[in-house]
Amino acid sequence: MKPLYFLVFVVAIFLSSCEQKPQSPVDAVDPFIGTGGHGHTFPGATMPFGMVQLSPDTRKDSWDGCSGYHYSDSTIMGFSHTHLSGTGVGDYGDIRLMPSTGKLQLEPGTEENTQSGYRSHFSHSSESATPGYYKVLLEDYQIQAELTTSERVGFHKYHFPQTDSAHIIIDLFEGVTSDQVLDAFIQIENDSTISGYRRTKGWANDQHLYFYASFSSPFKHFGIQHNNQNQAMKTYAQGGKIVAWVDYKTAKNTPILVKVGISAVDVAGAKNNLKAEIPHWDFELQRGNAKNSWNKALNKIKIGKSHNKEDRSIFYTALYHTMIAPNLYNDAEGRYRGHDMEIHKTDSGRHYTVFSLWDTFRALHPLFTIIERNRTAEMVRSMLDMQSKGGLLPVWELAANETQCMIGYHAVPVIADAWINGIRDFDEEKALQAMIKSANQDLHGLKWQKSLGYIPADKESESVSKTLEYAYDDWCIAIMAENLGNQQLADSFYQRAQNYKNLYDTETKFFRGRQNGGFIAPFDPAQVNFMLTEANSWQYNFFVPQDIGGHIDLMGGDEAYAAMLDSLFTGKTAITGRKQADITGLIGQYAHGNEPSHHMAYLYNYVGEAYKTQALIHQIMNELYHAAPNGLSGNEDCGQMSAWYVFSALGFYPVTPASGQYIIGVPRFDNATIELENGNTFTVEATNFSPDNKYIQQLTLNGAPYPYSFIDHETIQHGGTLRFVMGPQPDKSWASEKKHRPQRKITGDQLVATPSIKADSKTFTDSIQIRLHHPKAGAQIFYSLDGSLPTAKSQVYSDAISLTASTQIRVLAKFENKQSSAITGNFYKIPAGRTIDLATNYSPQYPAGGDIALIDRQHGNTDFRTGSWQGYQGVDLEATVDLGKRQKIKSISIGFLQDQRSWIFMPERVHFSLSVDGRNFTEIGVIPNTIPATLDGSIIKHFELDIVAHKARYVKVIAVNRKVCPPNHLGEGEPAWIFADEISIQ
């Protein structure tokens, strides 16, 4: 018996050792994290930065389904080859394949009744995913579908039951959204090959995608539905709606495999991609190749133990999500579609698409400068190529199209950050000129930013956010110019980088919107409005990464700045104003679910209170990241949400990209090692590591004391060990001395901020008092009342100015031989006695200046977000104007704006009535609407009634709201808006 006992002992030891074998990074990844809630990720198969994202489609035209998939869904419509990861706008879902059995169905059908189409129920219990692989059972057909990929090829494996009626549907019409199919064609080349093309207009205005599909077994029958007409054995169709199918007689345990190569260039490119990357039919081999590729990519950072068993999965899933986009865009032989829509070939390296730069400049691209340096150079060259062929650096680039989504010119910090961090494999002078060109446009409020030093809220939407973000981008240009030896250029952009000061209100200590020379009142920092980008004033109040020291000075010093940060994180979470789905993950008014807040927890280091940063980072990682489908607090945004976690788990974060500096936080693991591309390793260790020990007691670098709460990029690249000694109580003295804190301050010539104008209104009937203010003690304010530019010989402001006639006042300030930009205020005298009574309430989000807005003789422009239109949601507008006395009336008109993409429509009709006593009204005319609700763009229409002269004192205007958005509109059935402006009475 002894040999038997020995054998059992050996087997037990072997099994124990197997159980203790370290889990590979791929095995730790959970692609379902972020597929629920508002994460907007997809679970399907892709390669690191691959062209193909082969994933199931479960819903369409849904904000929470921007990736095509949401974990709460229970049906699948098919598997398409392109998807976006974590975006807030949907697109893609190109070239859908769907296996089915039984009656041939060529429409997706409905979720409520899957029998109405080809979609199928599925269950998460029979669904699994890992990087590069996805599997699910289509319950309605009992088909198990498996997916894997190479970089440019999707590989399908369908396990059909035994049946004479197996189908594979190829749908070129359906996508993630109801994008417009501009053109399409399909060619059934033989009994095992299909090729085609899909050209669409969606978020990307003109997207081209070609495919070449090869089937492992010849299909016995096939056909094409062209514009809803089925034709069996048809081999070609072009234009309109195209859905094809192939039929099989299948045996159990004999799967059908399909390889689909894609290309933005042509069918030949798609075919070549397929042959170059998957020339075989071994699905498991390719699945293994994908796993190996992901393991190699994820092993760039090796982590140790954490005090939370979920943390390993959260970390490696986050790292996985950072490597999904940007996406490869050139074919295997180097050809790609440029921003001029022509076909080009890469000179070296690879060409990329999907640049979500408003999000990713903050942490994703800085992460790449550490772990993806060669790829970063390729991405920078891709951006410069886009500029050379499309005119400007990308803002939000998608499939060779500039979407103009979001704000700023944030390719600039990505390029500057790469260069500052030693990535120089691109034309630096060409890069600098491209940066300057973006900054010197007149687009998107830049005209005003350049002339005034800020963007007025009535001239451009998102004026506060744009002013602040342009200032940071301009600092990046200054840094680049200075390092390239162009100091004069650098100085001019350092001045522009201080434009944030023009929006700073010393009374409230917030950045505020301005119009007519003054700050807009009333002011509520918790209010979400169109002066800000997906945020309220709290969530933009600390976006001065280029001049944190200057911002601290404005607030009154370290203590005042720290107190304001305390208020941010400890205040009430209530949000006022318009609804904004992106504002999630709240800690006080800090919103981790959206990007503007991401750096804020690290700002305490700048005022010597690093222990507060440590506590907050610990809290955010504990509360706002989980190993669950709804484990992200907001949109993944092409890797930014996850890049925050990767950096923070390592113990540092890039508060100011392009500074070459990272701010120390608190690590999540007892050790983590970064494998650098130069052959060095940088290790972060944490001793006394436990859930309660969240505070730094000591920091050492390569064994020597390191008292600083920041670390340089160059130090990381040299390799070494950064060791944290942790404890349960804060060491408030650690890194509290100024010499140990990070310093980020513009030290050259200081900008003289613009003065501000204070007045109760911009209209008056008798007189109005105007006051001028400048935040700098000792600054002189000069003004003119005749519209001329003030000079040193102009009047010097000393006390309130009384106006009794319509006047344009121009104002500037001088301090220490420097002067500010000149600002302008226009004040209008309107006839006395005219008043307005509103029987219906306008939305508090869109007051346009209050009740008087409809008779203030000011007219709105084509952008409703500038605040000059009065908005009514789901209700009619009923207004009665009292002229003060009985007058002869010849015409009445009222202006309306339509922007159907924002659910704003023309009224169905406008009724006009007159009265002499304000009680008894006579309707004198009705003007019907003639603008179709489907007409796109921003449209202004004046509903005008010319009448035979009537005498009346009261004029009533009723604009009939359609109440709900029309059928087939994205907001169908939801409350509709009407936006009104000036009622003119002649």
Q: Where in this protein do the model-derived segments appear?
A:
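Extracellular Ig-like/FN3 beta-sandwich strand-entry sites
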Residues: 719, 804-808, 950-952
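Short acidic/polar inter-strand loop motif in beta-rich domains
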Residues: 730-733, 816-819, 961-968
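Accessory carbohydrate-recognition regions in carbohydrate-active enzymes
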Residues: 21-365, 369-413, 419-468, 476, ...
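C-terminal motif of bacterial Sec signal peptides marking the signal peptidase cleavage site
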Residues: 15-17
